[in-house]
């Protein structure tokens, strides 16, 4: 059961990973158009949106037919909600159907949080991370409300396309969950792209004045009020589990304070015959976590029942700014708060031969090593190809390798992965 014919394949394929990373790649190309006019950049951006749509529609169609063409699968496009613990009502465009099952899986994903800012509702110049990717005209001035990972990805992308980007972040520090040296390197690198950061920014209203938006915000430290004009405003203020219309109460399925479905390590809800997978259960909102959720349920239903959520930690993640930021495990601050005796290793990207050949020398590599065991506790890579290289570190950690395994491993040359030799030396 899927409520939208535009969402087969889920968030990743349609409005998340695939379209954004397609645009990130196109933006990387656009960043080389140094002497181009804004009109030329706008034309390139318009084509990039078309490329994105081609990629997503092809994958959406493939995912739909993988289901619809299977002899054991019936697909309903409609809105589902629980009638009881084992009955789901599906309202299609033409009828209401009741489906009964002893095993039900909830996979409704997450939705964008729209903050209660005056002037945001029904404002045609205000976008979410979903709707802005349908915008075919490159905004000359883009204001992004929120400096988290989603906000930074779009800031980096649109700055590369040629927009003047301002990020309004309510906190005094950028990406507070990262170490300050990593966050400082990210901020400095993005500022080189022309991105402006306004910290301690509390957005009060967004006005639609003629053909432009006027964002009114104050500095939460000083109280001073500012106005910014923009051609588009992006709300990057987080996502929340999509549970509000499911009528979970009648099914005996409980949620936490954030609306996420509560599950055990086998993904069973408070009703053991109903499971929840993906973003709707809270936690890390990554496609590869959803895929591993499937593996857990597969093993629970048809296998040895040994696979569980606690087996997969730590999990790596990447933020596709330019260059990418990737991380796995504990950072330095977290390790020290846990009173771990750690060794900290750092390597500036400018010291990496492959980075020099690419002409991309901004960034920083950092590793956290347990001094007593020699095991890698965590790793942060802000560098070209970081989203690929982090998987090497992840495999070393998951297989229990000593840090010397990466220090002495024979990598190809020149490559970004060989920087691990120097980082762990």
Stretches with model-predicted labels:
Residues 3-138, 166, 171-175, 181-182, ...:
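Glycine-rich flavin
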């Amino acid at each position: 059961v899927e409520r939208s014919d535009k969402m087969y394949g889920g968030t990743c394929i349609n409005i998340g990973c695939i379209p954004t990373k397609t645009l990130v790649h196109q933006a990387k190309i656009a960043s080389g158009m140094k002497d181009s006019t804004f009109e030329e950049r706008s034309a390139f951006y318009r084509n990039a949106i078309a490329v994105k749509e081609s990629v997503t529609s092809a994958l959406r169609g493939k995912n739909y037919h993988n289901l619809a063409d299977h002899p054991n699968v019936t697909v309903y496009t409609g809105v589902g909600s629980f009638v009881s613990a084992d009955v789901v009502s599906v309202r299609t465009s033409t009828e209401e159907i009741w489906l009964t099952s002893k095993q039900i899986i909830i996979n409704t994903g997450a939705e964008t949080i729209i903050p209660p800012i005056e002037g945001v509702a029904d404002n045609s110049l205000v976008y979410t991370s979903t709707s802005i990717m349908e915008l075919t005209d490159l905004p000359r001035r883009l204001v992004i409300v929120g400096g988290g990972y989603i906000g930074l990805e779009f800031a980096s992308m649109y700055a590369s396309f040629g927009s003047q980007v301002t990020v309004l972040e309510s906190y005094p520090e950028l990406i507070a969950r990262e170490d300050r040296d990593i966050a400082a390197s990210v901020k400095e690198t993005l500022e080189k792209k022309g991105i402006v950061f306004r910290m301690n920014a509390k957005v009060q209203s967004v006005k639609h004045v003629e053909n432009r938006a006027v964002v009114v915000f104050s500095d939460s430290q000083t109280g001073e009020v500012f106005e910014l004009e923009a051609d588009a405003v992006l709300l990057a203020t987080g996502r929340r589990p999509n549970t509000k219309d499911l009528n979970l109460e009648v099914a005996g399925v409980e949620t936490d304070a954030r609306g996420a479905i509560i599950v055990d390590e086998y993904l069973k809800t408070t009703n053991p015959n109903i499971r929840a997978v993906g973003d709707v259960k809270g936690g890390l909102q990554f496609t590869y976590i959803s895929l591993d959720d499937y593996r857990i349920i597969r093993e629970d239903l048809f296998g040895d029942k040994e696979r569980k959520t606690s087996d997969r930690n730590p999990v790596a993640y990447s933020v596709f700014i330019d260059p990418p930021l990737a991380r796995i495990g504990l950072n330095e601050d977290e390790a020290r708060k846990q009173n771990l005796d750690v060794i900290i290793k750092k390597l500036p990207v400018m010291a990496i031969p492959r980075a020099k050949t690419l002409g991309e020398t901004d960034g920083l590599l950092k590793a956290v090593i347990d001094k007593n065991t020699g095991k890698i506790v965590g790793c942060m890579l802000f560098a070209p190809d970081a989203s690929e290289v982090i998987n090497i570190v992840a495999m070393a950690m998951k297989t229990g390798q000593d840090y010397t395994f990466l220090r002495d491993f024979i990598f190809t040359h020149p490559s970004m992965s060989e920087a691990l030799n120097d980082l762990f030396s």
